[in-house]
């Protein structure tokens, strides 16, 4: 019986060590940061048609894919509600890039407690393979960031998913 209890305690301790926690990662040289439950590795840098820097990363954990796209706008735009229109246009572009076939519609008006210039929106997507997505986009007129989580099949919305989607930090917040 003692051996069984010792083995049980060791296994429980091992499982606790395997539990994932949020860790903050630098988004390339953008000055922005994001919290992930898995290691996204080195952020890949590419350039958009207007020469804006585009940083991307994705990792998998708990049968979910966790990702981020961060665009450092070459020409900073407007802030406040007008910036939501630019963000919505970018999300529309991403729907095509990710083969999204249906969406719930943008939930606008999200703000960040410590950063008045930030505007955000959420949406729920389904792609051509039947994968379910939840996304949250942010902009401050200088950056556009899209945090996303998707699952093969049904995506269970959990506190963990929402914590991740709220885990973006603009350069100006540092």
What are these regions (language model features)?
Residues 56-89, 145-148:
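A short acidic-to-branched-hydrophobic micro-motif
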Residues 73-76, 130, 152-155:
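Solvent-exposed loop/turn segments at secondary-structure junctions
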Residues 32-58, 91-139:
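Signature of long, low-cysteine stretches enriched in small and polar/charged residues
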Residues 1-22:
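Bacterial Sec-dependent N-terminal signal peptides
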Residues 20, 28, 40-41, 83-102, ...:
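Surface-exposed amphipathic alpha-helical segments
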């Amino acid at each position: 019986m003692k051996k069984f209890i010792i083995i049980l305690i060791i296994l429980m301790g091992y499982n606790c060590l395997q539990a994932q926690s949020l860790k903050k990662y630098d988004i390339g040289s953008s000055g922005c940061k994001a919290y992930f439950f898995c290691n996204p590795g080195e952020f890949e840098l590419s350039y958009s048609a207007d020469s804006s820097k585009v940083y991307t990363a994705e990792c998998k954990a708990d049968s979910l894919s966790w990702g981020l796209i961060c665009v450092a706008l070459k020409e900073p735009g407007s802030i406040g509600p007008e910036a939501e229109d630019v963000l919505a246009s970018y999300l529309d572009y991403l729907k095509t890039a990710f083969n999204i076939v249906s969406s719930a519609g943008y939930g606008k008006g999200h703000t960040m407690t410590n950063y008045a210039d930030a505007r955000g929106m959420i949406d729920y997507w389904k792609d051509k393979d039947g994968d379910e997505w939840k996304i949250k986009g942010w902009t401050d007129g200088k950056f556009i960031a899209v945090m996303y989580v998707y699952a093969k099949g049904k995506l269970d919305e959990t506190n963990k998913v929402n914590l991740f989607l709220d885990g973006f930090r603009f350069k100006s917040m540092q």
